[in-house]
A protein has these predicted regions:
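Active-site loop/helix belt of alpha/beta enzymes
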Residues: 1-112, 170, 174-176
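Charged (often Lys/Glu-rich) extended helix/loop segments that serve as interaction or gating elements
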Residues: 78, 87-195
């Protein structure tokens, strides 16, 4: 594409962008991607295309449960030393890293549905409000807004929505003390959630 742009008088290639993934919990993929992108920038420069910016994308993970993603300082320590000498404008797309913990999905328990094999807490939120659990079984912390006393028995619930779809759940196998009408907070829902 860059070679083709060189042959067109009405277009100018000014930068290169990459996106290597999402919810990354190690700096190694970022370092590897940067090596590859910088090699491409060097190859393009040798062919006469000088770029003015690099967008290193996003993908930096957050802690939903027990993940240990790199801190922003650790992330920067891997990338900045190699970028400083280039004189390129550097863009990044922190996305989830800044948005996830900024949002909470509040939902109400509509009713409890006990069965012989499993207990369900049917809520008024659904997979269309927060797709991560249904799409790839992502863990989301779900806590009662007002915790119940020990007078309310703890049960192991699947937290499910009202959509007529077997994949409509926000959490599975959660030990909670609940009654119909309780408010639940699904934390870390600021990224990829309708909050």
């Amino acid at each position: 594409m860059y070679r083709h742009i060189q042959s067109l008088s009405h277009l100018e290639a000014v930068g290169i962008d990459c996106h290597i993934g999402s919810q990354l919990t190690s700096t190694a993929p970022f370092s590897d991607a940067l090596d590859r992108v910088l090699a491409m920038i060097d190859q393009l420069a040798a062919e006469g295309t000088t770029l003015s910016h690099i967008d290193i994308g996003g993908g930096l993970g957050v802690c939903y449960r027990d993940e240990t993603p790199p801190t922003p300082a650790e992330y920067a320590a891997v990338l900045l030393p190699r970028l400083k000498a280039r004189g390129l404008k550097v863009y990044m797309e922190p996305g989830r890293a800044i948005a996830a913990t900024a949002g909470v999905l509040l939902t109400r328990v509509e009713f409890l549905k006990p069965t012989e094999y499993k207990h369900f807490a049917v809520i008024d939120a659904a997979m269309n409000d927060l797709i991560r659990p249904a799409l790839y079984s992502a863990w989301m912390d779900i806590v009662p807004v007002t915790p119940r006393s020990e007078d309310t028995p703890s049960e192991c619930y699947d937290i499910v929505g009202p959509v007529c779809e077997t994949g409509d759940f926000l959490g599975k196998n959660r030990d909670l003390r609940l009654v119909a009408g309780d408010l639940l907070a699904v934390t870390g829902a600021g990224a990829y959630g309708f909050v």
